Structures are given as C-alpha cells and as structure tokens.
C-alpha cells in the first residue's frame, strides 16, 4: 500500500482558526475509503513555528515514508485555491510565527528556487472540477508555508510533493 501524507497548519498570528487544521480532521474520516484505492492516508497538523518546520518534516519522512506529500496552507489574501509550482529560498524577516518569533536571519539554504514535483495543472483541474476557483501560482510567499514547501522539496524522497494555498473560508 502506498502512503499519502497530507498536512495542514495550526493557528498563527492573524489566523486564530486555520481552516487547513479542520481540513485534516475531515480528511481522516475518509481514510477507509482511500484505503480501498490502495492508499494509506496520514494527516498531520504542523505548527506555524519557523524552528520546527524542518525537524517535523524529517520526522514525517522517517516515520511515514510518503509516496505523495501534499501540504495545505491558509493564504488570507487570496480568493482562490493556489497550487504552488515553486518554493523560494526566502523568508519574510518581519513576520512572526505562532511563538511570536522572527525567522533566523540566515534564511533558507540554496538553491534559490525549487520546483514542485507534482502535476500542478492536474491538481488545479481537480480542484476546479469541485466548483472551487483554482489556479497555479509561482509565489508560495515568505512565511512558514513557503518554508515548509521548500524544505519538503529539499528533504522528501516522495515522488510527488505539492502545496496548495487555501483562501479564507467564509
């Protein structure tokens, strides 16, 4: 059986309720149906803490050995689902995490840009088929979402790694 790991994030400054956290609970209810398709579903809620990103992803890699790693993160200013196509070696040094800490000034390792290892166009089309607006994006931001996507692309042995930004749910 192959392993699909899906992650969301906990609350952070500016988002006291993160819809991707509740998405993980909803997905877990479908684990048996997904297993009938030959996939073991594992969900995780990641903390929005700069210093915990890489260690948590290494633990997921070691313990779960995902074949597909799919991250969801909240993008408060976007009005549609955004399938990220690349992550950049940058962090916004002015944005605090859930512990109200700023990122390390050394930032992320090089290379400057890492490209997604998943078919963004197919993922956009799948989201659009549900009736939700979706598009691909070349900017995963400068916060923990970009850091997570960058670290996953760098550390994961998964054949496919993807990141989807979710708009606010009203």
What are these regions (language model features)?
Residues 147-170:
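Active-site-adjacent mobile loop/cap segments within catalytic or ligand-binding domains
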Residues 138, 142-144, 148:
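Short, electropositive alpha-helical surface patch
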Residues 1-140, 154-158:
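N-terminal catalytic or cofactor-binding beta/alpha core of small enzyme domains
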């Amino acid at each position: 059986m192959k392993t699909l790991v899906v992650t969301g994030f906990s609350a952070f400054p500016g988002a006291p309720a993160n819809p991707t956290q509740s998405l993980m609970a909803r997905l877990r209810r479908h684990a048996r149906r997904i297993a009938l398709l030959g996939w073991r579903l594992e969900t995780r809620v990641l903390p929005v803490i700069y210093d915990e990103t890489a260690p948590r992803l290494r633990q997921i890699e070691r313990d779960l050995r995902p074949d597909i790693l799919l991250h969801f993160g909240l993008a408060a200013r976007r009005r549609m689902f955004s399938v990220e196509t690349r992550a950049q070696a940058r962090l916004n040094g002015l944005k605090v995490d859930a512990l109200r800490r700023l990122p390390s000034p050394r930032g992320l390792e090089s290379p400057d840009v890492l490209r997604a290892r998943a078919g963004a166009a197919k993922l956009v089309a799948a989201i659009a088929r549900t009736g939700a607006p979706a598009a691909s994006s070349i900017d995963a931001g400068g916060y923990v979402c970009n850091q997570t996507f960058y670290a996953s692309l760098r550390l994961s042995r998964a054949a496919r790694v993807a990141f989807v930004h979710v708009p606010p749910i009203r």
